[in-house]
Amino acid sequence: MSKKRLYEIAKEVGVESKVIVAKAQELGLSVKSHSSSVEEADANRITSSLKAGTAKDESKPAPKATPTPKEEKVEPKVDKASVAKSAPAKETSKAEVKEASVALKKPKSRNFKAEREARAKAEAERRKNGGGRDNRNRNQQGNDQGKRHNNDRRNQKGNGQGDHNKGNRDNSTNHDRNFQGKLRNDQNQNNRRDNARNNQAGPRIDLKARAAALKAEQNAEYSRQSETRFREEKAAEQRRAKEQEKARKEKQQAEVAVQKAAAETKPAPKPAPVAPQSAPTAQVQDTRRKKVRPNKSRDNRRVNEDGPKQTRNNKWNNQNQVRNQRNSNWNKNKNKKGKNNRGNSAPKPVTERKFHELPKEFEYTEGMTVAEIAKRIKREPAEIVKKLFMMGVMATQNQSLDGDTIELLMVDYGIEATKKEEVDNADIERFFVDEDYLNKDAMVERAPVVTIMGHVDHGKTTLLDTLRNSRVATGEAGGITQHIGAYQIEEGGKKITFLDTPGHAAFTSMRARGASVTDITVLIVAADDGVMPQTIEAINHSKAAGVPIIVAINKIDKPDANPERVIGELAEHGVISTAWGGDSEFVEISAKFGQNIEELLETILLVAEVEELKADPTVRAIGTVIEARLDKGKGAVATLLVQQGTLNVQDPIVVGNTFGRVRAMTNDLGRRIKTAGPSAPVSITGLNEAPMAGDHFAVYEDEKAARAAGEERAKRALMKQRQQTHRVSLDNLFDTLKAGEMKTVNVIIKADVQGSVEALAASLLKIDVEGVRVNVVHSAVGAINESDITLAEASDAVVIGFNVRPTPQARQQAETDEVEIRLHSIIYKVIEEIEDAMKGMLDPEFEEKIIGEAVIRETFKVSKVGTIGGFMVTNGKITRDSSARVIRDGVVIFDGKLASLKHYKDDVKEVGNAQEGGLTIENYNDIKVDDVIEAYIMEEIKR
C-alpha cells in the first residue's frame, strides 16, 4: 500500500498540518511531525474521523438566547431616608479608598499621626499644670504690646528721637518676656522628653537590637529637628517677605507724597519762599543725623535690666531708622551713580540655604568627586569632607572616590547606594544579545533567510539562477562562484531570501558566515558525485549554527544519477531523511531543467512556518555585512542583510570598524529603495571605508554618536593589532631560528571584493613547502595602483590581482621597476601557481603579451548570432586568433576567445590602431558601451 504524508492529507482536507498531527496522535498513530508518513488505511481513518467530528459540530443546534427574566427589571422599592443615610457612607468609603490609594503611592515616611497625638497629650498636660498657659499669656501680651508700639512708630513720619527710643524700650521689654517664656517652655519640653525616655528604657537584652533601636531613634530625632527647623525657617522667610513688601509700599507712598509736595511748590511765582520751606528740612536732616547715629550705637551696646543683651529688636530698630531716613530725604545723592554711593542702598537680607530631604537611593559611578556627590544628595561639600575624615579618609571636594568609599559614605547617611552600569556606546554586539532592545508586542512574521551550500560545481548557482530566471552562472569565471550573493524571490505571496556561498575549499570562512546569519540551509548534493569534502563541511557549519537542513539532490536528469546512494552517504554524517525516521527533508531536483523546483520552495516555506521566524520592524536596524568592495565611482559599497528593524536612507550607521550615513540603497535587482525591512538584502553607499565581510552593523540615533562609536572601534582594532607581537620563548625558539633560515615569497594581494581577499590570503598562508613560506605584505580591495607597485619594489614582492586590472600608470611603473604582476580570475589557479613556484616546479614556458586595446562604441543584437560590439582600436591591434578580456570599470567581467572579427562587412585577421570594426566573443553576449576589450596572446619565452 502507498503511504501519504500528513501535510498532503492536510491539503486534501483543507485544514492545518498541526490539526492532522493531533488527530493522528489521538488515534494512536506514531507520528512526530507533519512530514511523517502513514498508510493509506490510516489516512482514511484520520479523514473520516475529521469529517465525523465536523458533522457532529454542525448537527448541534445553536443555543437559544435566554431572555432576561422580568423580575430582574423591576426595581425594588427603597426607602428614601435609608438611601439618604447610606449616601454619606458611600462618599466616606470612596474618600477612604482615595486616601488609601494616595497613601500607597506616597513613599513611606514618619508616623505623623502618632506625633500629633503625642503633642496633643503633652499640650493637655501643660494646660493641666497651668505653667505653659501663663507663659503663653505673657508672651501674647508682650507680642501685642510690641506690635502696637511698632505700628504706631511706622505710622508717624519724622517723629523725634525720644518717641523712637521709647518704642525700642517697649519692644526690648516684650522681647525679654518672650525669651523667658520660651526658656520655660524649652525646659518643660526637655523634662517631658527625659521622662519619656526613662519610661521607655528597659533591660538590655540584645545588643544588636538595641543598637538598631538607638540608630532609628536618632534618625527620627534628626528628622523631627530637621522638619522643625525647616518650618521655622520657612515661617521666618514668609515674615521677612511680608515686611519687605510692606516697606516697599511705604516707600512708594513716601515718594508719591514728595512728588505731590514738589508739584505744589513749583507754580509759586517767587523763588524767595522756597528757601525757608527747604530750610527746616535741612535743619531736621542735620538734627536727625546728629541724634540718630550716637543713639544707634548706644542702643546696640545697651544691656537690659531683665536679662542679657537682645539682638532681635535691633532688626526692627534698623528698619525703623531706614524708613525715617527715607521719609526725611536726608541723603540727596542717594540716586546718583558713583563709587562713593555704593553703600547708600539698604543691605539685602541674606537668603539662608533651604533644607532638603536626603534621597532614599543613590546611583553612583566609579570615580565621582566629593563635589558631585554633594550636589546629588543636596548637602554641603564641607559636610561630606568632614564625614570622610571621621571615617579615616582624607579627601578634598575635587578628589575622586572609589566605589567602596562611596558606598560607606551612603551607609553613613542611610541611603541605599547602587552602582550605575556603564553602557559601551561602541559595542554593537549588545544590540544582538539584549532582549530588551526588541519590542515583543511589535513582532511580525519575516521572510526566511536560506543559504545554499554544497561542493564545487554541484549546481548551487545554477539552482539560484533558475529561481531568479537570470544567467548569473554564465558570468562566473571557471564556473565557480567567487563571492557571496544575496537575492530575494517571492513564492505564493511570501518572500524568501537566498544567500549563495562559494563551494571551493578556500572559502571556508565565508561559508561559516553564511551559516551564522541563515535560518534554513539548502544542501546541494549532485546525484552522480555524492558526498564530497565541502558537503561534509557545510553539514558541520549548519549543525554548529543550529539551523535545519533541507537536502536538494541535484542532477537527477543524468543517466548515472543514484539518489539512494546519496541518501545513504548523508545518513552516515547525521543527515537522515524523514522517510528513514529522521528530521531532514529531501527533495530530488534538476536545477538545469527546473524539475521539482516548486516542491523545493514549498518545503522551504513549510519549514519556515514551523520555525516561527519573527522580527521587530519598529526598532533601529541591525544586521550583518554579506560582502563589501570598493567601486571606482561610488567608493565603499557594502551588501547588508537586515536582521531586525528597518533601515532607511540617511540613517547614521556603524559597520564593523567604520561609520557613515546611508546615501543610497539598492535592492538585489539594482533598483533604488528608501527603506528595507527585516530579512531584506540591500547594497548601500556612504561608508568611509570598505568593511570586512561578516561584520555586524547597527543604526545609531544621530551622526555624532555613530562617528564616536566608529572612531572608537577603529582605535580599538588598531590597538589590538599592535598588541599581537610574537615574543620569543623556549618553546618557539627553535621555530624562530628556523624561520630565519627560510626563504620567503612576498606577495601583495588585490581583489574585487573583501571575501576574496580573505580567502586568497588564508589559502596562500596554508601552503606548506619545506624551506619556503608565503608572507602577505599587503592585501586590499580595488584595482592595482602605483602605491602597490612602489610597495612591491621596496619589499621585492609579487603583485597578485584577482578579478582586477592595474591602472595604466601602475602598468607603466611596473615595467620600469621590473615588478611582476600576476592576474587571475580563478582562485585555485593562483594557489597552484604559487605552490609550484615555491616548490621550484613552475615552468614559465609561456608569457601573456598584450597586443592591443579597443573601446566598444556601439552594440548590435542579431538573432542566431548574438551581440556584436562595434569598437575602435585605441592601442596596438586586435587579431582574429587572440584571446580577449572584457574590462568594465577596472574589473574583469569575462575572459574568452574572439568568435569573429570584421572590418566593415569583411572578415579580417586583424584591425590596426585607430581603426574601427566589429567583433563577437564566444559564449558571451553581455557587451556594453564603453567596455574595454583587451587582446592578448600567450608567447613562448626563451629559457
From Swiss-Prot:
SUPFAM superfamilies: Initiation factor IF2/eIF5b, domain 3 (SSF52156), P-loop containing nucleoside triphosphate hydrolases (SSF52540), Translation proteins (SSF50447). It comes from the Bacteria. Residues 554-557 are annotated as: G4. Keywords: Cytoplasm, GTP-binding, Initiation factor, Nucleotide-binding, Protein biosynthesis. Signal peptide: none annotated. Residues 500-503 are annotated as: G3. The keyword Nucleotide-binding applies. Residues 454-461 are annotated as: G1. GTP binds at residues 454-461, 500-504, 554-557. It comes from Streptococcus thermophilus (strain CNRZ 1066). Residues 590-592 are annotated as: G5. Residues 445-614 form the tr-type G domain. One of its GO terms (molecular function) is GTP binding. Pfam families: EF-G_D2, GTP_EFTU, IF-2, IF2_N. One of the essential components for the initiation of protein synthesis. Protects formylmethionyl-tRNA from spontaneous hydrolysis and promotes its binding to the 30S ribosomal subunits. Also involved in the hydrolysis of GTP during the formation of the 70S ribosomal complex. Residues 69-82, 112-137, 145-155, 163-196, 224-253, 296-309 have a biased composition (Basic and acidic residues). Residues 254-266, 313-332 have a biased composition (Low complexity). It is found in: Cytoplasm. This is Translation initiation factor IF-2. Belongs to the TRAFAC class translation factor GTPase superfamily. Classic translation factor GTPase family. IF-2 subfamily. The gene is infB. GO terms for cellular component: cytosol. Residues 29-357 are annotated as: Disordered. Residues 479-483 are annotated as: G2.
